[in-house]
């Protein structure tokens, strides 16, 4: 299974692509989409850059599923609203590309990748490097996106074990595997 992770941001959005075969994770690609091509106050222009960039990444790498970080509400409500719009452009591009979309919080991703939810960005970068056997540290946005893909790989494996263990979860497991529920 090929998983595309997206770490949304209005200025810089990270993406990471990971192949999963059983318990084996393989790095495919990662990078960032920068909206600096649009004027600072041109929100619609920035959102279009994100939409087009995510659409291009999805077409190039042909993932089976995508995962996006859930926006947290921070101290500045205006920043939260802007980030939410950037995230919306990313999710819309994924759905337009006919991809099922899973969502995880930063805390869930950090816990899955590092082992605890309060991990620093540098810890996420290092663990992503180790888990994917990369020669160097990925950038922070790309590392978060790769971390989201790794998180979904782990969640998918856990759901598979759960689905096999109990007959009550077989229908839910099938829905999860098809991307209709999460």
Swiss-Prot record:
Enzyme Commission numbers on file: 3.1.21.10
One Pfam family per UniProt: RuvC
Alphabetized UniProt keyword annotations: Cytoplasm, DNA damage, DNA recombination, DNA repair, DNA-binding, Endonuclease, Hydrolase, Magnesium, Metal-binding, Nuclease
Residues binding Mg(2+) 1: 7, 141
Cofactor remark from the record: Binds 2 Mg(2+) ion per subunit.
InterPro entries: RNaseH-like_sf, RNaseH_sf, X-over_junc_endoDNase_Mg_BS, X-over_junc_endoDNase_RuvC
Catalytic residue positions: 7, 69, 141
Primary residence: cytoplasm
Cofactor requirement: Mg(2+)
UniProt keyword Metal-binding present: yes
Binding partners and assembly: Homodimer which binds Holliday junction (HJ) DNA. The HJ becomes 2-fold symmetrical on binding to RuvC with unstacked arms; it has a different conformation from HJ DNA in complex with RuvA. In the full resolvosome a probable DNA-RuvA(4)-RuvB(12)-RuvC(2) complex forms which resolves the HJ.
Biological role stated in the UniProt entry: The RuvA-RuvB-RuvC complex processes Holliday junction (HJ) DNA during genetic recombination and DNA repair. Endonuclease that resolves HJ intermediates. Cleaves cruciform DNA by making single-stranded nicks across the HJ at symmetrical positions within the homologous arms, yielding a 5'-phosphate and a 3'-hydroxyl group; requires a central core of homology in the junction. The consensus cleavage sequence is 5'-(A/T)TT(C/G)-3'. Cleavage occurs on the 3'-side of the TT dinucleotide at the point of strand exchange.
PANTHER family tied to this protein: CROSSOVER JUNCTION ENDODEOXYRIBONUCLEASE RUVC
Protein name: Crossover junction endodeoxyribonuclease RuvC
Organism from which the protein derives: Paracidovorax citrulli (strain AAC00-1) (Acidovorax citrulli)
